[in-house]
Amino acid sequence: RHLKFSGLRVERSSFGPGDLSAYWSRYERDDARFIDAAGNERRDVFDLRYAGKRAPFDWDVEAMGQTGHVGAASIGAWAFGALGGYTFASLPGTPRLGLQVDGASGDSHPGNGHVGTFNPLFPNGYYFTLAGYTGYSNLIHVKPSLTFKLAPTLTLMTALGFQWRETAADAVYGQGMAVVPGTAGHGSRWTGMYAQLRADWLVSDNVALALEAVHFNVGDSLRALGARNADYVGMEAKFGW
């Protein structure tokens, strides 16, 4: 299968209180298959991101647009991600109240010769949690969080994540744009929620450990198809040099 990826990226550091970056990329894949289209995929991706910090606030916002075609069908898709926080530096444990909001388009009008499903291309499967239950297509995700610094090198984060489909006309997607069978055009937009508990320990300058637990409660539309609640516990170790 033919696959080609190319692009151009520009960055501007210290743009106000943050860093600004933008890129264009071209994704080419032969014999691509979507629910509503099949053929050679040619997708142009446009991205703009701004991240920074001005105490007590921090933020990281990104917007993406996609055009092109899959076979004879045109592409028009979008996505965004926004993470922000407020740190109470004067309180014990310097708690940080955070909010993450994400969205990725789905195909709201199947059969019209237009593919609206966002393709995350090479996604970070651990973007939401280490459990990696959810893909970044046809998605609305809202996640409030609270983080405490228990020690200079140890932090504890608790969060609740709430998930919907952007449109019920399209499917629920897992990692790698895997379609959950029977979901396209059926059920409600609500797909479920999860609770997350994560501890991060910076052991040394080049060693970091993380322990994470996630409980996912599936929505009724998925439960009707046989899906069940899921629990995940995992540990991650990072070593750098």
Task: Report each predicted region and the residues it spans.
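C-terminal beta-signal and adjacent terminal beta-strands/loops
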Residues: 202-228
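Active-site proximal loops enriched in glycine and acidic residues that flank catalytic Cys/His/Asp
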Residues: 24, 63-65, 101-103, 158-162, ...
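C-terminal structural cap/anchor segments
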Residues: 95-96, 101-194
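Outer-membrane beta-barrel "beta-signal"
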Residues: 201, 228-241
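Flexible, solvent-exposed coil segments and beta strand-coil junctions
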Residues: 25-30, 60-66, 120-128, 174-181, ...
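Conserved catalytic-core motifs characterized by acidic clusters
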Residues: 70, 116, 167, 220-221
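Signature for the C-terminal beta-barrel architecture of outer-membrane proteins
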Residues: 1-111, 149, 169, 182-186, ...
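A short pocket-lining beta-strand/turn micro-motif at the edge of beta-sheets
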Residues: 152-156, 191-197, 203-211, 231-233
